[in-house]
């Protein structure tokens, strides 16, 4: 954090630089997902999408379909549906199933867990919290990923956390 900026490089960059970086990264993620994740290869092919033909964010908005819960549930039982090498898995999560439409299964590796709080840290800093501030975290840890997410966000923002146990 520099002054009032969480990341001065990107928060003060010219719009064209931000858009160019975002475009490159989005296209890379879509291409990597197609190459590495059986679910996305199946999903994109079913939609007739060829990621190599995407060039702009406008192409992405126009051509890339949204993934629905029904899509995830349809493919979830297929072998190898996730991109992670199972040896690298550090955490497993199920959704709560409150929608009644089945439960989604999610896995996270060390890199996922290390990056977990980064986005949340920005929101805390943008909301006015500063390193050394204290926060009382009352989100249940045992029920959802929200508790660990907010804890990681506070840690990434260097905000002190007091967590309560809520059941």
Identify the function of each model-found stretch:
Residues 110-122, 134-167:
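AMP-binding/adenylate-forming
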Residues 1-118, 122-126:
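Nucleotide 5′-phosphate-binding alpha/beta core
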